[in-house]
Amino acid sequence: LGLVAAGLYRTNPNDTILPPSNVSLFSDVSTVGFYMLGIRGTHIFPQDKYRTDYTVYFYSFPCDYWGMGYDMGNDDSNKSEMKRWQARIKGSFLFHLGSNFYIGPMVSYDYVIGKNVERPELLNGMDRHTWNLGAGFSAVYDSRDVLTYPHQGLYINLTQCFRPRFMGNDYAFSTTELQVDAYQEVWKGAILAEDFRTMLNFGNPSWGMMALLGNSNSMRGYYEGRYRDKHKIEAQVELRQHIWKRNSLTVWVGAGTVFSKFSNIRSRHILPNYGLGYRWEFKKNVNVRIDYGFGKAGQSGFLFSINEAF
């Protein structure tokens, strides 16, 4: 059973030029023991002087685990079970520098527990209970016309988070994340959207903080975490076509890979991704999203969410 809710609002209702802030609430409960509750959004202050991006969620679910590295995830015999519990609090406060540029501090807290681990040797001796506290900065360029359903513009987000040992982290490492999105209207009712993203972990990340392929935003259709390593690179292109009234359809193609260091990148390790989706306009510029994604060797998955994947 899933529940999603979303809202748009302006901190100054009289300023029609100010982009609307957005907030999304999401939750899931299943009969197999999965539950999740979270909230995320962007709060834009009057005159767009500041912005706050935030994500808070926790979940618990029985999951499959293959180990770390492309080769481990690619081997079906490594599939094992565990119960994973995770909580995350992540936020940034950005100052508007002008000309669509924003920069400011960010903080992140993660707490991960692995219970009932069927094959503990796949954790490579790492603790089953880990937590990480980090701080850093985010630099953003954002010329999108609408944050939740862009028709045109460019979005670039570079985030650097440090998790040093003196902050109490048992696993000390730093994370560099880059996301680049572009949007163009190609014909009547059609939007072409491109997305590139990478996560690079330098140091000693725990099994629960590795870069994971597969989620509701990228590499849709892959089991999240089957392919995990210190680093990942992903890219996708999506065509969004309005059909009739509140109804739209999408198709996408993409690819991604995980690796422990750049010298280990191999063309044969690049994983394909493609799929199609349906959009129902819940309210202006807010879509309910249903996607079905496909991956390597028959891997596939159904996703239900709010707002676009990127």
What residue spans do the PLM features occupy?
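Outer-membrane beta-barrel "beta-signal"
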Residues: 136-139, 276-282, 299-310
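Membrane-embedded beta-strand positions of outer-membrane beta-barrel proteins
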Residues: 5, 23-27, 52-56, 103-107, ...
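Transmembrane beta-strand segments that form the barrel wall of outer-membrane beta-barrel proteins
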Residues: 1, 18-31, 37-39, 154-166, ...
